């Protein structure tokens, strides 16, 4: 059984027991969260596709950890003009473990 849900402007394909890295959620570590924006649920040959969301579809997950991703360097450069700027960015993320999928 697997499902596709939407969180943080992105779509994720998950199954029970899987750990997924999402955009930062303001929920403490160890707490549970429910995702109601379920786009599709598949159980063997039975597939439910939402328009846009599956009615009654809920994905339950437990927050495992929060953190920051790898650093991305941004460089602004003009040749022959002695001009260079560097900037870095580290995106916040939340790791969640999927505990249940229901339709």
UniProtKB/Swiss-Prot annotation:
Q: Which GO terms describe its cellular component?
A: cytoplasm; ribonucleoprotein complex; ribosome
- Recall the GO molecular function terms of this protein's record: rRNA binding; structural constituent of ribosome
Report the record's Gene Ontology biological process terms: translation
InterPro entries hit by this protein? bL21-like (IPR028909), bL21-like_sf (IPR036164), Ribosomal_bL21 (IPR001787), Ribosomal_bL21_CS (IPR018258)
Keyword Ribosomal protein part of the UniProt annotation = yes
- Identify the keywords attached in UniProt to this record, alphabetized: Ribonucleoprotein, Ribosomal protein, RNA-binding, rRNA-binding
Q: How does this chain assemble?
A: Part of the 50S ribosomal subunit. Contacts protein L20.
Described by its record, this protein's role is as follows:
This protein binds to 23S rRNA in the presence of protein L20.
Q: What does the sequence similarity comment in the record state about its family?
A: Belongs to the bacterial ribosomal protein bL21 family.
Q: Which NCBIfam families match?
A: L21
**What name goes with this protein?**
Large ribosomal subunit protein bL21
Originating species: Shigella sonnei (strain Ss046)
């Amino acid at each position: 059984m697997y499902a596709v849900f939407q969180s943080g402007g992105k779509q994720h394909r998950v199954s029970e027991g899987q750990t997924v890295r999402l955009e930062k959620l303001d929920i403490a570590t160890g707490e549970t969260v429910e995702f109601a924006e379920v786009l599709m649920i598949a159980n063997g040959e039975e597939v439910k596709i939402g328009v846009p969301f599956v009615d009654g579809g809920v994905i339950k997950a437990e927050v495992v950890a929060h953190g920051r991703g790898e650093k991305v360097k941004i460089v602004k450069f003009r040749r022959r003009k002695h001009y260079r700027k560097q900037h870095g960015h580290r995106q916040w993320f939340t790791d969640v473990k999927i505990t249940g999928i229901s339709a």
